[in-house]
Curated annotation (Swiss-Prot):
Belongs to the SAMHD1 family. One of its GO terms (molecular function) is GTP binding. The active site is at 196. It comes from the Eukaryota. Residues 128-259 form the HD domain. The lineage of its organism: Eukaryota, Amoebozoa, Evosea, Eumycetozoa, Dictyostelia. It catalyses: a 2'-deoxyribonucleoside 5'-triphosphate + H2O = a 2'-deoxyribonucleoside + triphosphate + H(+). Zn(2+) binds at residues 131, 170-171, 254. Binds 1 zinc ion per subunit. Residues 1-24 are annotated as: Disordered. Substrate binds at residues 113, 128, 174, 252-258, 262, 305, 309-314. The keyword ATP-binding does not apply. This is Deoxynucleoside triphosphate triphosphohydrolase SAMHD1 homolog.
Length: 514
């Protein structure tokens, strides 16, 4: 096999239940009888968020114009109510439905949120479709709350609307198996580059052009695109750009939703309470700041992210399958021209997780090698995890792209193409920095001034380092696992390094299915 996927540099930096415990009196704030809102929304009582109204003797609520006093809703189509396992009953405005009811957005149903992790955790089969709707819901809820609690900011309906749209469309550009696809494109080399955020903006433009959404002009699209990327923020009103994609400290509603949603479907509990973060925050000097006592909640947010990456998203079996899918795509690329469909959204729309099944059921002889790899995935004949080492930057004595070559030289009968080197970085979404140190806080006693809090003033149990680097070795040939492991450990010994004992697998186990 002409292998181009020899090593992987993976950096998981941010740059990718059923009922909520709401206080009813808090929830109905913003809903009241209004002669300007003729739409009457009936909610099923007895479960979810609206069940809390029963004790108040309220069976029907009318949507408030509190957030949009200058809007005539009588001419608008009805919004929809979606019952979500994470956020309960979500009201989806008609302008959001205009985007949802398109083939470009519906494609997200065929993109699993956790990529190849679903091969390891079978209940985690949720898609980017519901995640994107959830992010839109939280984005709207967040900016609506800021508008109500801080009217002096004069947040416009346009800003509220576009923040929701940005939350909805931020993942439109993901490819098959999400981040695994981006890694595969990077390994192709040459001029091939792919960033899902850029494709998301292309898909957004296509939706607007293709479906006659003429109310959005070029300035509107530019604004929404900046919200998706979290870039090109002006000095004034910079806080609006922190809601969906926060490049300032990585605290955003995208993270709120996927950490909660993934944990739910993975059967894992999460300690972070993102509802409190939204409730106890305010804008000071054009930056979203948090109540000082929420600093522990913020650390829980980033620790939850780190734990999911370490234990779930980078699970060795999931990564093994990811490498096999990458090899299958590489073998199929010359025939299917997958890498030629990365620029035009009208071609890219055909790339989803179903590409695997498309290859698997094909009859073309040109796809035989790819079909064989996919068959091995189905039969659980996977690439084998050989070894892992945790390293410090100052102790690395080789580059990742030369390690496979070094192992092949030391070993007997080992080819470079037998080896996959994964260079993995795990962190708090801010590379090697503490994201909380880039976050500002306020106190109840003076909510007009913001400040930072040193971690030494918070707790001595907060880590001193915020990024760890690991080197993992996988082998494509189960017959050569023992030789690869022996050669790798010889290299480690030469560099005064030792493998990670918690992940070390004996050669005898290596030849079994994982």
């Amino acid at each position: 096999m002409n292998n181009t996927f020899k090593y992987v540099n993976e950096d998981v930096s941010g740059t990718e239940g059923e009922e909520s415990d709401y206080d009813p009196s808090e929830f109905i704030r913003g809903y009241h009888e209004s002669p300007r809102s003729p739409r009457l929304i009936d909610y099923e009582m007895g479960r979810g968020l609206m069940g809390n109204f029963k004790g108040l003797g309220i069976n029907k609520v009318r949507q408030s114009n509190e957030y949009d006093n200058d809007t005539d809703y009588s001419s608008r189509k009805s919004s929809k109510i979606i019952n979500d396992v994470i956020h309960g009953h979500m009201e989806v405005p008609d302008y959001i439905m205009d985007f949802i009811d398109t083939e470009q957005f519906q494609r997200l149903r065929d993109l699993k949120q956790v990529g190849t992790t679903s091969f390891v955790f079978p209940c985690a089969s949720h898609s980017r479709f519901e995640h994107s709707i959830g992010v839109s819901h939280l984005a709207g809820k967040y900016i609506d709350r800021i508008k109500v609690t801080q009217p002096e900011l004069e947040i416009t309906e346009r800003e509220q609307k576009f923040v929701r749209i940005a939350g909805l469309c931020h993942d439109l550009g993901h490819g098959p198996f999400s981040h695994a696809f981006e890694s595969w494109v990077d390994q192709l080399g040459g001029s091939k580059r792919f960033h899902h955020e850029d494709m998301s903006i292309k898909m957004l433009n296509w939706i607007i052009d293709d479906h006659g959404l003429d109310e959005y002009d070029s300035d509107d699209i530019k604004f929404i695109s900046s919200l998706i990327q979290g870039k090109h923020r002006p000095k004034e009103r910079a806080f609006i750009y922190d809601i969906v994609a926060n490049n300032r400290n990585s605290v955003d509603v995208d993270k709120f939703d996927y950490l909660s949603r993934d944990s739910y479907y993975l059967g894992r509990s999460t300690v972070c309470d993102f509802q409190r973060l939204m409730e106890f925050s305010k804008v000071i000097d054009d930056q979203i700041c948090f109540l000082s006592k929420e600093i522990y909640n913020l650390y829980e947010l980033f620790h939850t992210r780190y734990s999911l990456h370490k234990l779930v998203y980078t699970h060795k079996v999931g990564k093994s399958i990811e490498f096999m899918i990458a090899d299958a795509f590489t073998e199929a690329d010359q025939f299917l021209k997958i890498s030629d469909q990365l620029e035009d959204p009208k071609e890219f729309i055909n790339l989803s997780d179903s590409l695997l099944r498309r290859i698997e059921t094909s009859k073309e002889p040109e796809l035989e090698k790819s079909r064989k790899i996919i068959k091995n995935i189905r039969n659980r004949n996977l690439y084998k995890f050989v070894d892992e080492i945790i390293v410090s930057t100052d102790k690395i004595r080789w580059s990742a792209d030369s390690l496979a070559e070094d192992i092949a030289k030391v070993g007997n009968g080992i080819l470079e193409s037998d080896i996959i080197v994964q260079n993995l970085k795990l962190n708090y979404a801010f590379k090697d920095k503490d994201p909380v140190q880039s976050t500002r806080f306020y106190t109840r006693y003076d909510s007009t001034q913001s400040f930072t809090i040193k971690k030494e003033e918070t707790s001595h149990l907060i880590p001193n380092q915020f990024q760890e680097e690991r080197i993992r070795i996988f082998c494509r040939s189960k017959e050569k696992c023992e030789q690869v492991q022996t050669a790798f450990r010889k290299l480690l010994k030469n560099h005064n390094l030792s493998p990670n004992p918690s992940f070390t697998v004996s050669p005898a186990r290596n030849i079994k299915k994982i």
